[in-house]
Every structure is written in C-alpha cells, then in structure tokens.
C-alpha cells in the first residue's frame, strides 16, 4: 500500500470505468 488517501478516489472511480483503472491503481499503490 502507498497512500490510502491517494487510492480512495481511484477505487471509487474504478467501477464507473471498469477493472482497468482498478488494476492500475492497485499496481501503482502496491495493494
């Protein structure tokens, strides 16, 4: 994990745009 505050908006937006941004956010943040 990198920053919860940074991941939260990405995770919140992920379902609207699909799994692509979710996977990118997870990879970028180390989750």
Swiss-Prot record:
Coiled coil recorded as keyword: no
Highest taxon of the lineage: Eukaryota
Statement: the UniProt record of this protein carries the keyword Isomerase: no
Annotated Sequence repeat ranges: 7-10, 13-17
Keywords from the UniProt entry: Cuticle, Repeat
GO molecular function list: structural constituent of cuticle
Note on domains (UniProt): The tetrapeptide (A-A-P-[AV]) repeats found throughout the protein are also present in many proteins constituting the protective envelope of other species.
Purpose of the protein: Component of the cuticle of migratory locust which contains more than 100 different structural proteins.
Protein name (database record): Cuticle protein 54
């Amino acid at each position: 994990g990198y920053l919860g505050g940074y991941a939260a908006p990405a995770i919140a937006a992920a379902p609207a745009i699909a799994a692509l941004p979710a996977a990118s956010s997870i990879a970028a943040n180390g989750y």
